[in-house]
Amino acid sequence: YQLTKDHAFKTDYSNASRTQMFNVSALDWDEELISLFGIKKEMLAEICDSNALYGYTDFDGYLEEAIPIHGVMGDSHGALYGQGCVNPGMIKATYGTGSSIMMNVGEKPIFSDKGVVTSLAWSLSGKVNYVLEGNINYTGAVITWLQKDLGLIASAKETEELAKSANPGDTTYL
């Protein structure tokens, strides 16, 4: 929205599916859920294909001419696509502040009762792909917690030596 200087209020299916207000089966905002929050559908972004034209930007005048914005995708979803996991059964793992294991399940959603989330991977030219994803929200950020909050390490680099000194047969709790 800001990149287009308030001209386009749009999102893609991958981001919409993460709001908890999107029906992944109907591929639209869920009327029942949004009404629970007192939200009108008109207040929500238009949902577009990931490769749709979202508008134009000149980056607040840094470019002489505005350029088109054509690629919008959630971060983990973009990582899945960027790592070439474009076919059903292909999986990627991302480790950072949080961690994500995501599997492309193809053109039909699969719902699990095992704690993984069903969402849209992307929609390219009208064709959607679904994913199953397991998240750990605070994995890489735990290093900062060990250092700054608990004072157990002086730097992130220390964790390498600690890991090397650990006995794989020992039980570790964190």
What function would you assign to each model-found segment?
Residues 46-53:
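Gly/charged, well-structured mid-domain segments that form the phosphate/adenylate-handling core
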Residues 1-10, 15-16, 20-31, 35-36, ...:
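Active-site core segments that coordinate phosphate-bearing ligands/cofactors
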Residues 42-43, 156:
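A generic structural-conservation signal
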Residues 38, 44-45:
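Short helix-boundary/re-entrant hairpin motifs in multi-pass inner-membrane proteins
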